[in-house]
Amino acid sequence: MGNKQGKMDVILIGAGIMSATLGTLLKELAPEWDIVVFERLEEAGAESSNEWNNAGTGHAALCELNYTVEKADGSIDIGKAIKINEQFYVSLQFWAYLVNSGILRDPKDFVRPLPHMSFVQGEDNVAFLKKRHETMAANPLFKGMEFTDDPKKLAEWVPLMMEGRVVDEPIAATRIESGTDVNFGALTRQLFEHLKRKNVEIRYRHHVEDIKRTSDGLWELKVRNLDTGTVELHAAKFVFIGAGGGSLHLLQKSGIPEGKGIGGFPVSGLFMVCNNPEVVEQHHAKVYGKAKVGAPPMSVPHLDTRFIDNQKMLLFGPFAGFSPKFLKNGSMLDLFTSIKPHNVLTILAAGVKNMSLTNYLIQQVLLSKEQRMQELREFVPTAKSDEWDIVVAGQRVQVIKDTESGGKGTLQFGTEVVHAADGSIAALLGASPGASTAVHVMLEVMEKCFPERMNEWRAKVKEMIPSYGESLMKNEALLRQVQASTAEALGLNGHFAMQLA
């Protein structure tokens, strides 16, 4: 039996961007609450939030073609893009508040302005992109988005991508200045430094082995100190499971009925990073292409300017891979041990329904360096093999569950909150847009888990996030105000110049 510790108001499991965001929100709204964080690794932001384990895209649906779909009548549905864009503005507003309050330091350490572009080839794809641009540019959220199918204009926008290119089919791109590159690792670390100053106890190298409900309605966690091997029991009124790929196992251990019937499918990612600074300097944008037929949404190829440790870099990917691990630092048994009697049929159904995904992953795993270079050359025709290295990114666990629309064993490509009916425990599952919408998602957790308190907190939340509870698309005056204030605070001036014009 472990050594029993005191009772806390809140326990956060996992020191990633989600726990960092929730902890920071709670400390602004309920500074008197006692909060403790448990993290298995030795530092914050070391798994999916780490800057090398994600693409660093501020997902605002400016360039990601999988967030806009062509309907049967040929029109473009931008509903999902609108939703994600508004959610990213929530993050920008909160970060701006934290900078203005002195909680976050120099914003360029974690966010930089960077044009976002969509790039396609082939007659049908160009027609789709043109229609998408017409639909989006008419919306206030996407004002300022440009379209061109002129190779000369493209050579101005992306010289590296056009150099040496044989243009033997239609080619086009959209470009919008208001994109961002976000270093979620740096942001996470800064937020945890702040929480430490606010007397939040952060226990690194502490692994949560079990979660159970006690007779008095608390949640008791069995926590092992990985340095000493000792086990402690910690209790809290509210528990947030923000452990990335580790969340599903912990949700299952909690025993809440809402966690039944959910499975996870792990997908790993590889990127290619350019080691020639002269090549890196020739590109300044995040350029997203179109997923190949049969490929999953998270496989959309993109060529990204990144800023890591204040150094400009150039990455291309992702190439998908498969590992049964649910975390980069996880166990090879993760997938197997996540299969339970209550989710086995759901997982099997997903396997049958997603043979194309399975085949795609097998093909990706077997790619040689030269085959990866061929894919890169679709973006950078002059790419030389010795100037690009392969880096292994993080693991993502896609949610599998039964849905009304998709039926049994449907793969959910997105971010999902699962919470107990009484709001005493919540878990975050899934992947993209993930970190970009962290503030919106954590407010959703708070609305579901602290509904009465949210009424008291509403005025303070509105102070931090002026658009809270409103649609920016429907309130253009507020949108302009938010664009101007976030650009000013986050050093993104010029960032919204075209929208504000």
Swiss-Prot record:
It catalyses: (S)-malate + a quinone = a quinol + oxaloacetate. The lineage of its organism: Bacteria, Bacillati, Bacillota, Bacilli, Bacillales. Pfam families: Mqo. The gene is mqo. This is Probable malate:quinone oxidoreductase. It comes from Geobacillus kaustophilus (strain HTA426). NCBIfam families: mal_quin_oxido, PRK05257.1-1, PRK05257.1-3, PRK05257.1-4, PRK05257.2-1, PRK05257.2-4, PRK05257.2-5, PRK05257.3-1. It is an enzyme of class 1 (oxidoreductase). PANTHER family: L-2-HYDROXYGLUTARATE DEHYDROGENASE, MITOCHONDRIAL. Its cofactor is FAD. Keywords: FAD, Flavoprotein, Oxidoreductase, Tricarboxylic acid cycle. One of its GO terms (biological process) is tricarboxylic acid cycle. Its EC number is 1.1.5.4. The keyword Oxidoreductase applies.
